UniProtKB/Swiss-Prot annotation:
Keyword Transmembrane: no
Cofactor (UniProt): a divalent metal cation
Organism of origin: Mycobacterium tuberculosis (strain ATCC 25618 / H37Rv)
Name of the protein in its database record: Catechol O-methyltransferase
Matches recorded under Gene3D superfamilies: Vaccinia Virus protein VP39
């Protein structure tokens, strides 16, 4: 970067990635494989993934539920945070995405602690075993977030943590918007704030993925 060039969020992300994450062949290969399979580029960033990993480790999560696998990038981070004795159940609607994720998880050396469940999450959630869960990460179709959170509360232990991605939508949650995802994000935050079984907050984020954020809630 030249002396006269102002830093921007993607530049800062690049610095943080090189400084705090470093080279990680398994993660790089997971992203490359997802691109090769033409999966949408909507995975969490490396910093967000590292946050999930550290959060899982900090609360000693041994049973993790993920709703929305995509290519398994965030799943790898969650599995690392849960550790060798942990178990991650990840739900994915698209069979193609699940296939890519399974290969990525195997390459990353965490496939033995991850179960990939294929199908609409609202159909598979009632069938899940392996709970109660210590940590739930929701990053799927936004219009069903409220239903996913309701299921997360049922399946989680008291004191568990629920994380919901993409809840700021570039500030779209404040606008009179035709964006269904922004409307869903606002409804999600309102539900989390009003639910007697949750104590919630939200953090805005900025980086190469733009202006967004995540909600975090403790199950009471």
């Amino acid at each position: 970067m030249g002396m006269d060039q102002q830093p921007n969020p993607p530049d800062v992300d690049a610095f943080l990635d090189s400084t705090l994450v470093g080279d990680d062949p398994a993660l790089a290969a997971a992203l490359a494989a997802s691109d090769a399979a033409e999966l949408p580029r909507i995975a969490v960033s490396a910093q967000q993934g590292k946050f999930l990993c550290l959060l899982a480790g900090a609360i000693q999560a041994r049973r993790v539920l993920e709703i929305g696998t995509l290519g398994g990038f965030s799943t790898i981070w969650l599995a690392r945070g849960a550790g060798p004795q942990g178990r991650v159940v990840t739900l994915e609607y698209q069979p193609k995405h699940a296939e890519v994720a399974r290969v990525n998880l195997q390459r990353a050396g965490v496939a033995d602690r991850v179960e990939v469940v294929v199908g609409p999450a609202l159909d598979t959630l009632p069938t899940l075993a392996g709970g109660p869960f210590d940590l739930v990460f929701i990053d799927a179709d936004k219009e069903n977030n409220v239903a996913y959170i309701q299921w997360a509360i049922r399946l989680a232990r008291r004191g568990a943590v629920i994380v919901v991605d993409n809840v700021i939508r570039g500030g779209g949650i404040l606008a009179e918007s035709d964006d269904a995802d922004a409307v869903a994000a606002r409804r999600t935050l309102q539900m989390m704030g009003e639910h007697p079984g949750l104590d919630a907050t939200a953090i805005q984020t900025v980086g190469r993925k733009g202006w967004d954020g995540f909600a975090l809630a403790l199950v009471r």
